[in-house]
Amino acid sequence: MCIRDRDKYKQFIRRREIRVELQNAVDHNFKNFDVYYQPIIDIHTRNLIGAEALMRFTSEKFGMISPAEFIPILEETGLIIPAGRWMMKEAMGKCSEIRKILSGFRMSINISQVQASKSDVIQDISAEMKRTGLPLEAVIVELTESDLLEQNINEKHFLTELKRMGISLALDDFGTGYSNFHYLSELKPEIIKIDRSFTAKAVADEQEYYLLNQFCTMIHNLDMKICIEGIESAQEWLKIRKLCPEFTQGYFWGKPCGYEEFVRKFVQEK
């Protein structure tokens, strides 16, 4: 067996073992799953205004697995539907707790294409709203740009129902796909999240910065808000803030962390 084939075989075995662990975790009350929270900052006040809920999984054999590795497995197997429902329940419950301290706090929850097209995610959101008593403005649903470009009939129904309910939509990873402003005007998301890859290029190159500036101007002209993702240093922040986004997030403000650490670092101190 050549080295390339051997590496592919190792990857196949690893993927298969992770898939088995994921199934076992879902079957046993989502054992080894966790939800991390990354702060979202208001650009004008530099205060915490919300968080993005992020799914995490720790393998008993391999340790913490990157979401880029385990999320696709969840989607391929359909396990993203129960796992996503579990994460939504956790995140909305924690949002309710934080709002007792910070009344305007909002929770952003990622919904995958599989969830939007194959599950009763709208009913799940509605049920959790009733259970937690959260107002509509407390929850933001995040969909990626690539998922929206591939939307099918069921996803269109999902977006229609989302609007009907009055739940805010955020378009995540903007700049990584086709970035068609026509569909932006149709969907009218409240927030456009500029991807880290776009941000990094803009900081390093003046032409890229000019392009991002034009994007931001067009987004604002469509009456949408902007969240710049991936700010990792004060230098980046000083340059990016000139684009006048409403919100920002990134390691400069705080890395994703567990709920107790998040509350200790970002909520109780406020």
Model-based region annotation:
Residues 95-99, 129-130, 156-164, 213-220, ...:
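Surface-exposed amphipathic alpha-helices with a cationic face
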Residues 45-49, 79-155, 230:
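Catalytic core of bacterial c-di-GMP phosphodiesterases, primarily the EAL and HD-GYP domains
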Residues 8, 78-79:
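Catalytic-site/binding-pocket detector for metal-dependent nucleotidyl cyclases
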Residues 10-11, 60, 112-119, 138-152, ...:
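EAL-family c-di-GMP phosphodiesterase catalytic domain
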Residues 1-5:
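Conserved small/polar residues in nucleotide/adenosyl-binding loops
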Residues 7-10, 14-73, 110, 171, ...:
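Active-site core of bacterial EAL-family cyclic-dinucleotide phosphodiesterase domains
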